[in-house]
């Protein structure tokens, strides 16, 4: 196994964020540096750089990993090398060039630590989230954002409406998109907006997606041209899949595609000029 620590730029990593192509991000700053900062890179979880053997076995199989420290110096490089020499043969790992400071300078999104219990998640203890069964829009959009920006290992539970709060307490799960909880509708805004607000995620593409979600979820398709289409696709997925988790799996692709379109393809047009005769 190659023992050389390989770097990835903040710009490259930003381009991967918000999709299934994104690597697993591990914050390996020294504990004092981690505790002194109020944010982590979006989707990152903290792991002790001096106890790699304690958490290595809990990493998911066959997923690329990026580790970062403050400036991309010895802490992240040493951790990266340790992962690459783990003997598993499956840990393709890189370190973030310039660390979290380079990420912030490049405008990469971060999330506020402690905006919800158990975030960032601990070793072998992913956050759990619970909401009403038979999701349509917000209850698919929120899990997408949680997996892509907050906790990539998060687990989701769908329950009958009258059981959500009881089961949330029983299973130490975070309730969302139900009345009277932290992550729910606020005025004319939906639960997706509440997550962005409370985790203080500063990402223009995510803000644009939030407008589309809000229009589809609150019956205001005039908010964004894509809202009506998202509503149609969401209702179609609900009609196709009786299993809520299967619908979530399919819905993740929808939001990956919408987010990618916002980031990279909004200016692209499609017409029939190719078929017109000269």
Task: Give a label for each model feature.
Residues 241-244:
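Terminal low-complexity "docking" segments
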Residues 224-229:
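Short, well-ordered alpha-helical segments
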Residues 186-190:
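C-terminal catalytic/acceptor-binding lobe
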Residues 157:
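Segments forming glycine/polar-rich beta-alpha architectures that bind adenosine-containing cofactors
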Residues 162-164:
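Intrinsically disordered cytosolic tails
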Residues 1-24, 28-66, 71-143, 148-153, ...:
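Rhodanese-like catalytic fold shared by cysteine-dependent sulfurtransferases
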């Amino acid at each position: 196994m190659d023992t050389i620590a390989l770097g990835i730029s903040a710009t490259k990593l930003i381009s991967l964020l918000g999709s299934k192509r994104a690597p697993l991000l591990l914050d390996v700053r020294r504990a004092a540096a981690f505790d002194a900062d109020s944010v982590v890179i979006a989707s990152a979880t903290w792991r002790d750089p001096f106890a790699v053997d304690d958490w290595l076995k809990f990493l998911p199989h066959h997923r690329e990993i990026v580790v970062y420290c403050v400036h991309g110096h010895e802490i992240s490089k040493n951790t990266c090398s340790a992962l690459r020499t783990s003997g598993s043969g499956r840990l393709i790992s890189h370190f973030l060039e310039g660390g979290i400071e380079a990420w912030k300078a490049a405008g990469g999104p971060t999330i506020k630590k402690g905006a919800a219990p158990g975030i960032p998640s601990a070793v072998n203890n992913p956050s759990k989230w619970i909401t009403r069964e038979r999701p349509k829009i917000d209850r698919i959009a929120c899990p997408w954002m949680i997996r892509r920006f907050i906790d990539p290992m998060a687990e989701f539970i769908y329950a009958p409406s009258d059981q959500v709060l009881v089961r949330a307490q029983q299973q130490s799960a975070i309730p969302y998109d139900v009345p009277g909880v932290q992550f729910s509708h606020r005025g004319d805004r939906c639960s997706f907006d509440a997550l962005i607000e409370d985790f203080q995620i500063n990402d223009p593409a995510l803000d644009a997606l939030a407008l589309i979600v809000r229009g589809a979820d609150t019956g205001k398709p005039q908010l964004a041209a894509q809202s009506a289409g998202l509503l149609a696709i969401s209702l179609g997925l609900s009609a196709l899949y009786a299993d809520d988790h299967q619908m979530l799996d399919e819905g993740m692709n929808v939001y990956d595609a919408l987010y990618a379109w916002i980031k990279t393809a909004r200016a692209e047009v499609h017409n029939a000029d190719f078929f017109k005769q000269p």
